[in-house]
Amino acid sequence: MDNDDYIWLDYLTVEQPNQEKTDISVKHYYGIDIKTDKYLQNAIDIWELINKYGKKYFCNYGGETFQINIGDRFYVAHFPSQCLNNGCKYPVLIFLHGLTGYSWHSALDKTGLIELANQNNFIVLFGQGNGEITRPVRDKYGGVSFGDIYWQIENPELDMDYIRNVMNLQGTIEYCRQDDLNLLELRKMFSDKIYLIGYSNGAMYSFNMCFYDLHFSGICSMMGGYGGLAGYSNSKISEIVDRPINISLDIPIIILSGSLDEYLPASKKAFDILLGKNFSNVKFLSIPDRKHTYSRDFEKYIWEFFFTSTKN
């Protein structure tokens, strides 16, 4: 294989899971004390809470928030209270976390999508990538890692059955209130508007979905873009974007990056590819002085762009 097929960004490397460090070794290695690292401690608290209750954890943040299991994988669903039991249909947003991410952490801490869903009356589903979830640590690049967890960027078809299941609310509920929530009835609440947001590794997967007919109504690739410039095989990603396009070319798409993000070239290339393929409703945003970080402050902008572009 040509060397040009792989252009690596070092911080993609994932530490080996199950190498748990003591408080002393963590402080020595990272120069921090995990007891004073609020963000890491929040991640640990969430992991311990979910680990304690297993598949039965349930919480209420302005609605019903719970885990749905599909074989050896799962996803987290949130239905706002005002959307339940009124017979109406509501749009759905699916979120894909970044490399080493965790859906429960995305739902309860990293993103503000549950609050946004409560405010704007939509359903939000948090996908879970491939790999074993472990107790979170700071990796050597400073990020919080839940293990070697990822989306199938070079072979997106391997995750597509899972994504379809999420879109159709497939799976089982295994907590003590399962008799109160019927997935078949909840699925009837879905409108025909299903949107996709991916961050980092999830953003690269989301960009790939621009070339598959899964009937998404809008797609956002945040801090990711074209995987062939972000550590994955350029030839394999080229094959994906050169597929025959069977989706509407006016689907609203946002490519969002930061001016200091190492993935900015990958995001720019993603935008150029979409324009070259005659997609007609594409926005490119480069946030000034923003590094590679989840941009919670742009969630509302993304949602409003999706909603206003597809409200008819």
Swiss-Prot record:
Q: Which PROSITE patterns match?
A: LIPASE_SER
Keywords on record: Hydrolase
Identify a single GO molecular function assigned to this protein: hydrolase activity
Q: What is its EC number?
A: 3.-.-.-
- Which residues are in coiled coils? none
Source organism superkingdom:
Viruses
Similarity annotation: Belongs to the AB hydrolase superfamily. AB hydrolase 2 family.
Q: What is this protein called?
A: Uncharacterized hydrolase R843
